[in-house]
């Protein structure tokens, strides 16, 4: 999105994407526990070879994701007003940001749903499926972005629409893969399990620490963009590009996080404590090495 709007006739588009994306990040990143929590519970069920719990972990998380996504869509006006309260951007930036926000907000159920599916696939020791779906989402997003912006002349609205379409394509692709590839598990789906309130309590309790960690992380990135808006639209645009480099680095480290979630849960479920100890030590060594290298 940032690359496409960067070639339009105003830096205000870059600033608008930065502001709108920061608002979305503040919302969605706080739901990242859907992916991390789901992968952990699923990996433990995988290690214990408990297909019923593998199905239950997906169902619980997916219900939470779709419910939260729908609520976000319903509260979009309030969220947008609250978001603009923290950003002192120019009028043009706010107008473009609002146009982008009002279209892309409808992707909320698909985005949170993908958090759940990604976490579940990783917990099932299947990292390839999320990777291929992510590649597909980005290819479709780029193609539609170029078409809507340069052919249909829709500018920032075209960018938002392209992202919206790509997210739903990714969600339904994940649903299709799950239905066809994991038939031995999906037959254990029982909606009566949704009445198990204690299971939901455990899910939220375990993920409370992740939520606190995410709040701290999002607060830093939001503060960075908020301060940038006070320095003018040019500084906002430049800092928005710098933030993309920070996010790019985080993707490298996410590989270790995915491995940790999948393998740690698997070894805990299988009660293989020695392998768990070896895994934790190696993850810390590789994580520190990569961090030092990038620094």
Language-model features: where?
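Transmembrane alpha-helix boundary and packing residues in multipass membrane permease domains
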Residues: 2-3, 40, 81-82, 119, ...
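Small-residue-rich hydrophobic transmembrane alpha-helices
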Residues: 14-73, 111-130, 225, 238-295
């Amino acid at each position: 999105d940032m690359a496409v709007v960067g070639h339009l006739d105003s830096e205000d588009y870059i600033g608008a994407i930065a502001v709108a994306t920061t608002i979305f990040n503040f919302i969605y990143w706080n739901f990242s526990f859907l992916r991390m929590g789901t992968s952990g519970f699923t990996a433990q069920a995988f290690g214990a070879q408990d297909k019923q719990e593998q199905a239950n972990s997906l169902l619980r998380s997916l219900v939470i994701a779709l419910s939260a996504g729908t609520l976000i869509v319903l509260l979009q006006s309030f969220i947008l007003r609250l978001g603009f309260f923290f950003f002192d951007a120019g009028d043009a930036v706010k107008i473009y940001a609002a146009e982008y926000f009002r279209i892309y907000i409808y992707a909320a159920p698909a985005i949170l749903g993908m958090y759940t599916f990604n976490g579940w696939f990783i917990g099932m020791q299947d990292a390839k499926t999320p990777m291929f779906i992510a590649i597909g989402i980005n290819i479709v997003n780029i193609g539609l972005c170029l078409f809507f912006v340069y052919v249909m002349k829709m500018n920032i609205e075209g960018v938002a629409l392209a992202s919206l379409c790509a997210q739903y394509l990714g969600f339904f692709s994940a649903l299709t893969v799950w239905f066809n590839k994991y038939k031995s598990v999906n037959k254990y789906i029982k909606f009566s399990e949704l009445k198990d309130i204690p299971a939901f309590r455990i899910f939220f309790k375990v993920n409370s620490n992740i939520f606190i960690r995410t709040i701290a992380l999002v607060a830093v990135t939001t503060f960075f963009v908020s301060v940038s808006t006070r320095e003018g639209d040019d500084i906002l645009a430049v800092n928005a590009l710098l933030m993309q480099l920070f996010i790019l680095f985080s993707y490298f480290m996410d590989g270790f996080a995915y491995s940790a979630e999948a393998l740690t849960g698997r070894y805990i479920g299988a009660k293989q404590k020695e392998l768990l100890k070896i895994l934790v030590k190696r993850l810390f060594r590789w994580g520190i090495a990569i961090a030092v290298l990038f620094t």
